[in-house]
A protein has these predicted regions:
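Canonical Radical SAM [4Fe-4S] cluster-binding loop centered on the CxxxCxxC motif
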Residues: 2-38, 224-225
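Short catalytic/ligand-binding loop motif for oxyanion handling, primarily in non-cytosolic enzymes
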Residues: 16, 27-30, 66-68, 148-150, ...
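A structural signal for short, well-ordered beta-strand segments and their strand-loop junctions
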Residues: 58, 88-89, 139-141, 164-169, ...
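Short, well-ordered beta-to-alpha junction loops that form the rim of enzyme active sites
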Residues: 62, 170, 225-227
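Structured helix-beta-strand junction loops
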Residues: 81, 106, 134, 161-162, ...
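Structural recognition of alpha->loop->beta junctions
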Residues: 101-111, 156-203
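Accessory C-terminal segments flanking Radical SAM cores
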Residues: 175-246
Length: 246
């Protein structure tokens, strides 16, 4: 079996303070971070204990994970496992990058978001170039607010041409975008048009819950982050039995 997992632990803190983010500049206690660390290690151990399956794992933390060493170590461990096909993580790229040398770079990938209100373009591009130099796969991206168009245009010019630069469309802002705004974002991201629609998925079957699941720090399985109803727990013996088309 090849199972794709979206992992989101109990981390809910970030070193950036973006106004649209509920976890902006939020801090956690040492005890809370230690709980997240323990949960993450349990998850890594669980992956280790199931070599008969293939896994692809995407970390989508509520906050910035890579400023914490336990996430760096977890990615290094997971990427070295032969039954793990890919390990990717969402990040603002504010961490030191030396840890990537402990990873299998054929398996590692970073989803790196530029926050022009919190970091200079020069600093962000420098981090991207460092990743490129270290031969780490990554994509760069920006939330699609029109006020940052000049920064986004400059970013595209300064990044290597082979680096994909995506625009994360803000659905609730789409009615306020001018045709020129949409044209600009499409010129930066050739896949932008796919991100500006609400797709009619309600009530339709999909692979979520069958070959793709989300997992939280306690091991609770859900079809995805957007469907809150639990379907099982990876730490229970019958976890495979709940995987089915829905």
């Amino acid at each position: 079996m090849h199972l794709k997992i979206l992992y989101r632990g109990s981390l809910i803190s970030c070193n950036y303070g973006c106004e649209y983010c509920p976890f902006a500049k939020r801090q956690q206690t040492a005890a809370e971070l230690n709980l997240d660390k323990q949960q993450l290690q349990r998850f890594v151990d669980w992956i280790t204990q199931h070599p008969q399956h293939q896994f692809s794992i995407l970390f989508t933390p509520w906050g910035e994970a890579l400023i914490h060493k336990h996430y760096q170590q977890a990615l290094a461990q997971l990427t070295q496992m032969p039954h793990v096909n890919k390990v990717a993580i969402q990040t603002n790229l504010s961490c030191n990058l030396d840890w990537v040398e402990d990873c299998n770079k054929d398996t590692l990938a970073l989803w790196a978001t530029f926050h022009p209100e919190w970091v200079s373009r020069q600093t962000y591009v420098s981090q991207c170039l460092e990743l490129d130099k270290r031969k780490v796969r990554f994509s760069a991206g920006v939330v699609g607010f029109p006020q940052y168009k000049n920064e986004i245009a400059a970013l595209r010019q300064e990044l290597p041409s082979h680096v994909y630069l995506w625009i994360n469309a803000v659905k609730k802002e789409l009615p306020n975008l001018s045709p020129e705004d949409k044209s600009f974002f499409s010129s930066i991201d050739p896949l932008y048009h796919l991100n500006i629609h609400h797709y009619p998925s309600f009530g339709r079957s999909c692979r979520a819950g069958e070959s793709v699941i989300s997992v939280d720090g306690e091991g609770t399985m859900r079809r995805c982050h957007f469907i809150k109803e639990p379907i099982g727990n990876i730490y229970h013996q019958n976890w495979q039995e709940v995987l089915q088309e829905r």
